């Protein structure tokens, strides 16, 4: 992971936001954004990787992140990474694909979410979710080939 003052701030906020959450397999949820951040190669993508589920899955808002001093590019990418319940999943993915920060983070997020070693038993619901992730990855990778 890249360690700068800004990434350390995001790391602490991520930990605080997710500290009491667990993932579908019962592991501390915070391991997921930490893993995604480990895949990133620059400060901006590392910060967004750490914060990518904070607004969607916790009580934090974009305004809270702005108050913490995160810049416009970070806030825009986090906003794009935040899936609103009323938006079809692939429409949400299509909206973020033209933002290079959000696209890089989402690809790593999808790869980690598709990792069978962290899923456990693969039932029909999980198969459908994995298929949805596969389509999302194809959509994002299609954009990067232009």
Residue spans for each PLM region:
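Active-site helical microenvironments for divalent-metal-assisted chemistry
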Residues: 1-146
């Amino acid at each position: 992971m890249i360690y700068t003052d800004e990434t350390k701030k995001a790391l602490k906020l991520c930990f605080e936001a997710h500290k009491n959450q667990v993932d579908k397999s019962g592991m501390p949820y915070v391991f997921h954004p930490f893993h995604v951040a480990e895949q990133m190669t620059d400060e901006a993508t590392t910060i967004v990787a750490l914060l990518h589920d904070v607004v969607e899955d916790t009580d934090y808002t974009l305004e809270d992140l702005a108050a913490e001093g995160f810049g416009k590019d970070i806030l825009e990418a986090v906003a794009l990474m935040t899936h609103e319940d009323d938006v079809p999943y692939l429409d949400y993915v299509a909206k973020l694909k033209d933002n290079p920060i959000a696209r890089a983070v989402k690809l790593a997020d999808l790869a980690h979410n598709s990792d069978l070693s962290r899923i456990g038993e693969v039932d029909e619901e999980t198969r459908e979710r994995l298929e949805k992730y596969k389509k999302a990855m194809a959509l994002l990778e299609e954009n990067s080939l232009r």
